[in-house]
Amino acid sequence: MTQDEMKNAAAIKALEFIENDTIVGVGTGSTVNFFIEALASMKDKIAGAVSSSEESTKRLKAHGIEVFDLNSVDVLDVYVDGADEITRHMSMIKGGGAALTREKIVAAVAKKFICIADDSKQVKVLGNFPLPVEVIPMARSYVARELVKLGGDPVYRQGVTTDNGNVILDVYNLEILDPKALETQINAIVGVVTNGLFALRGADILVLGSKDGIQVIQ
């Protein structure tokens, strides 16, 4: 299977975790785009979706899936999203598509977080993929200096503004041995909205597409 075929296979498998008449949390990214296509096949069986980005909202609506504001939803049974990296402990780096804050909010509300990915995303240690940090614009330089103190090499992602009106610093050369501690430490920097470590609230289930087929890891 090609990488896209692995992503698509994982996306289709994730439909098995979607119950009828529920509102589905939907993430953002290339793998999630396959999931949205798959979800459209059962759109008449679900109540609708909550989306983590403007891009996913457009795709969902284009398929005739109703999109709810998260503030109007008390509970989400399932949130389905991809990852840039994920470990066997279900900690992730996310945010390559700059939607990390909304992704983290929707994940916090969901009872179950299902990560869909191809096997290139599974790693032993997080940090080869640069860690995105969403920052209030006026704090960009200050936050960058603080991230250097933590051993990282932050790079301003030019030309990118998040759905929340903020900027992204991509932090290179971090060997993340304690994801929960680093997630907390970076979030404590004044001016940081959040960072792309999903360790305090990691995935509950990983649906992994590989050349050998689909693995479901819990």
Swiss-Prot record:
Q: In which pathway does it act?
A: Carbohydrate degradation; pentose phosphate pathway; D-ribose 5-phosphate from D-ribulose 5-phosphate (non-oxidative stage): step 1/1
Family annotation (Pfam families): Rib_5-P_isom_A
Molecular function (Gene Ontology), one example: ribose-5-phosphate isomerase activity
| One GO term describing the cellular component | cytosol
**What does it catalyze?**
aldehydo-D-ribose 5-phosphate = D-ribulose 5-phosphate
Q: Whom does it interact with, and what assembly results?
A: Homodimer.
* Similarity annotation: Belongs to the ribose 5-phosphate isomerase family.
What's the protein called, per UniProt? Ribose-5-phosphate isomerase A
Gene name of the record: rpiA
